[in-house]
Every structure is written in structure tokens, then in C-alpha cells.
Amino acid sequence: AGQLFHTGTRVVTWMDPSGYDAYRCERRFAPFDQSSWETSKVAVAALKTPNRYGLRKDGLTDAQVEQVRGGGWDLPLLRDKVDQFVLHFDASGTSRNCFKVLHDHRCLSVHFMLDLDGTIYQTLDLKERAWHATTSNTRSIGIEIANIGAFAPGQQRMFEEWYQRDDTGWPRVVIPTR
């Protein structure tokens, strides 16, 4: 709700140069000449609006809606209306790939992405209604947790690509080039 909280871990917001910005209308990973709203709405069938988020207004009085629209949420009001964390296991491997899929291809958003190295990326202010959990969007904070997904026994190829042993025998993550 417009306030920064120190967490003890690296947090990169949508305002930082290396952040992921769910406020942007353009597709982040499309070639520049194909990333504008005008070209994106033709290229991506799911894209009906330049926004990938909305106003948290369900359960608010008319006066509260005007407060939120005019100056944003105060922390007590946000705490009163938001009571869920929705954790998504994205199977995209990294936060970068997750944002690409959510923002550029599926026209969705999420508040936070937790990357493999522990970095937290915040793509929207918590005052926004991210589009990640359909009917729970208004009352929830959306968090994507980077991982490669679940695989049936015998499907070791993905694990062999992503997890290798270093010189001392310890496992390490190696992001495949694709």
C-alpha cells in the first residue's frame, strides 16, 4: 500500500531497472517493434485491455472506493480486505520466464515472484488487484514460486538439465539455454 518493508532478502520492485513491471502495457519480451499495445492486441488473442490488473473494489463502500481511486489504500484498510496469500508453483523455471508467460502470453499478473536464488520480484503494489486467482483476486496477494514443475518417475531428463553436480559433488542449479 505504497510503503516499503525491509525483509532481509533482496527485493526488486517494478520501479527498479532490473524489475518486472506489471503496469506496463507493452509486452516485455517481444521484439521492440512488435511490443506496443497496438501490435500486442492483434498478436495475443487473450489481450482485451492494456492493463493486467484492476482495482480492489469488492466489499468497499462508495467512500472507500473514492479514497482508493483518489489516493490509494492505507495499510489498515488493505489489511481488513486482503486476507489470503495464493501461492502458485509456476513450472516456468525462473521468474523471468514466469513473467514472460504471465504478462506477454496469458495477459495476467501477480504481486510477487520468488526466484531460484531467493530474490523477490514485486511487479505491482499490493493495493492493486492482480489477475492470478480468478474469484480470489480481490482478497489475495499472488505469489509465483519459481520451479521446474513436477515429473513422473522415469522422467529424469529435466532434472538432469537443471541440476548438475559441481566439482565437490554438491548439486547446483544450471538454467538451460532455450
Regions found by a protein language model. Name each.
Residues A1-Q67:
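N-terminal pre-domains immediately preceding structured catalytic cores
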Residues R28, A46-R178:
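Active-site-adjacent loop/helix surface patches within enzyme catalytic domains
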